[in-house]
C-alpha cells in the first residue's frame, strides 16, 4: 500500500517513541530510524518530512551526527531540542552551553508563523511546554527567524519559512506540553502535506501479509499470559495463519487469582485458538529460590519460559517460531527501540530476558505499536472489550510485584490482596458513572517482604505490608499516579487487612513516571 510517510531520526531521547505515537495519532505512517541512517536509504524511504529527535548529547560530539544532506532534499524538517541544535549548528548558527539547565514546565511566548498558527488554547501567542536541555541556540543560521522565546532561552523556536525548516527547544511529544499534539499535527498534516492513511484496518491487512510471508508453513508457539498484548498478538497471528498457531499458557505460580481458568475459558470461547495449559509452578519456584535481584529474576523467568516452550516444540513437528506480544515501550525501556541509542532503564521480559541460545525464531507482530494502538487493533480484530481493556500484566507476572525473593507464600498473599483491589476499582464509580478500573490505566498490588507491627482485636500482630499502585497514562511512557478517592482506598485497605491473613498494613504509591517506573521491579 502506498501511503505518505514521516521519517523520525533518533538521537537518543528516552521519549523519541512518543513522537512516532503522536504522528500516528494523526493517522500518518511513520518510521523511527537511527540518526546515522544513510542518505540513500532516506531517499529510498521517500518521506514527506523529517523530524529530528531530542537527545542527551552535544552537537560537538562527532559520534552523534546525521547526514547533513537531509537539508538538501527539499522537504520540511522539524528539529526537537537536540534536533534543533543540530539544525542550527550545521546550517551556520551557533550552539552554546546555557547559563542554567532548563528542565520542566515553561511558557514560550510566540509570534504567528506557519508552525504556530491556530494551535493556542486560552492564551494567544503562549505555549505551555516541557523543557529538558542544557545547550541552546545562541545565534540563528542565515534565513531563520525567532518565532518563540522564554526568559532563559531567547531562541526557543526558530523557522526558515522558505525552506520549511523549524526548530523547537522543547518536547511537543510529551503530554506535559499542552499544545504539543496540535503543533505536531500542524507540521505533519499542513506543512508536510501528509495524507492520513494509517489506520488499524490497514495495519491488520499489512501485518497479516507480513506474518504469512515470514512464517510460511511453519508452526508458531505463542506464550499466552491472558494480558492485552499476548491476547491481541494471538488474535492477529491466528487471523494470519489459523491452526498453525498453538498458544502455550504457562502457569508459573505467579498469575493473578483464578487467572488460569479464566484465560482457558476466554480463549476457547472467543477465539477458538489451540491452547496448551502447562502447570510449571514447581519448576519456576525452584529456580527463583533465594534470588533477590530483579534483573536476575526476569532473566530466570525468561529462561524458564524458553525451557517450557522447547519442551512443547518437540511435540510440534514444524514449530520454528516463538511469538511474543512485545510492544514499543518494552523495547525502549530495554535499550532504546530499534536504534539502540537511548539509555537503558531495565530489561523487559519480552526483550532482554531471553537466553542467547534460544532455539526458536522470534515473531513479534506488535513491536512497533503503542499500548493504545494495541487496544485499537484488538477491537478491530473483534476481541471482546473485557479482554482488550484489561489492565496490562507483566510477562514475569507476580515475580516482579514481589520485591526480593519470590515464595509461594508471598504469591498467595499478593494474589488475594490484588484481587480485592481490582474488585473495588471495578465496583466504584466517579460522578459520571465510570468505574475507577476504567479510569485508571494500570492498577495492582505489590508485596513488600518486610513486616510491621499492628494491633488486631486485643492482640499484637507482626505481618507483611502491601503497596497499592494505580496510574493514569495514554502511552505508558510517562504516567501520573491516580488520585483515587480516600473512601475507596480505605475500603480496599480494610478488606485486605481483614480478609488476607498475613497482611496488616496497606500503603499507596504516589510516584509518577518519571522518576519512578510503573512496575516496582
Curated annotation (Swiss-Prot):
GO MF entries: ATP binding; GMP synthase activity
Active site: 81 (nucleophile), 171, 173
Catalytic activity: XMP + L-glutamine + ATP + H2O = GMP + L-glutamate + AMP + diphosphate + 2 H(+)
Pathway recorded for this protein: Purine metabolism; GMP biosynthesis; GMP from XMP (L-Gln route): step 1/1
Record flagged with keyword Nucleotide-binding: yes
Record-linked SUPFAM superfamilies: Adenine nucleotide alpha hydrolases-like (SSF52402), Class I glutamine amidotransferase-like (SSF52317), GMP synthetase C-terminal dimerisation domain (SSF54810)
GO cellular component annotations of the record: cytosol
Domain GMPS ATP-PPase intervals: 198-390
Gene3D superfamilies: 3.30.300.10, 3.40.50.880, HUPs
Keyword entries, A-Z: ATP-binding, Glutamine amidotransferase, GMP biosynthesis, Ligase, Nucleotide-binding, Purine biosynthesis
Signal peptide residue numbers: none
Residue span, Glutamine amidotransferase type-1 domain: 5-197
EC numbers, comma separated: 6.3.5.2
This protein's record includes keyword tRNA-binding: no
Residues at which ATP binds: 225-231
Role played: Catalyzes the synthesis of GMP from XMP.
Assembly mode: Homodimer.
Protein name: GMP synthase [glutamine-hydrolyzing]
Gene: guaA
